[in-house]
Amino acid sequence: MLMKRFTTDHLTTFAAVIEHGTFDAAAEALRVSPSAISQRIKVMEQLAGKVLLRRTNPVTPTQAGQSVLRIARQSEFLQLELERELVGEGGFQTVSIALNADSLATWFLEAVRMLAHEDEIFCDLRREGEFHSSALLRSGELMAAITSRPGKIPGCSVDYLGVARYWCVAAPEYMSRYLPGFSSTTTREELNRAPVVEYDRKDFVQEAARVLIEEDMKLPPSLEPEQSPTIYIPSSPDYARAVYEGVAWGLLPQAQCSEHFATNTLVKLSTKPVEFPLYWQHWNINSPVLETVSRRVAEAAKTGLLSS
């Protein structure tokens, strides 16, 4: 049996309740009575046959409500897109995108520039962890995200972008101070004492880098997790600067270290790179704006990432 469809008023009301946190605040924003808000939500839950909102403070969507919220936000986006097309010149639209800091620092900004200059589409960029990005895509708060996993998020399409290549590197003065005679005579104890820089406490890529370094040093696998002095720098440019200035060793995107290899101002701690595939997850809706954004992102990735 097919359920009856929600109206535009239903979807607008639902999104407003989530955005403002309470029925009263949503009523004020929409200029209707709180009882009208309550009645619309009640009708929606009757149509769905499920509870869509948790009556907490602030109000939050249930799992079923997350799907409704995504549709509500997509509906609002498509209405704005229609207005933009009808208005013609002078209209613009904003697209919310989550990505990692390294992508923004090395290749994604070209897509942002082209969208703003050529298409009058403006990006609301957010640095989010991949798990949180997935939740925000499901709820419709984000329209797209750069991810390192290909698993399709409900309501979204996924496109392969390319491979981001990183190198384990350090400055020569850092090597002289902490890892003299590196590779030939360096011990695990010396490596454990050598400071490392990480982006934040959710940054686990250094573990993969450490494995490659120990393989090059021909060290036997460690039975215990290794812990080095760690400096946390949640900024891609400042993270790179810390490596350049010999503060710590770190994992840098190829774009941030290629010139330094040519001038011998960075040393590789491993002969093998660390590589991550990147994917473009975006709402699965028929939208000229999102199609344009996807095209610009793919163009930027073509020059900024490896093809395989």
Language-model segments: residues:
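Short helix-boundary/capping micro-motifs
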Residues: 15-31
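Alpha-helical linker/hinge and terminal dimerization helices associated
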Residues: 47-48, 68-90, 95-96
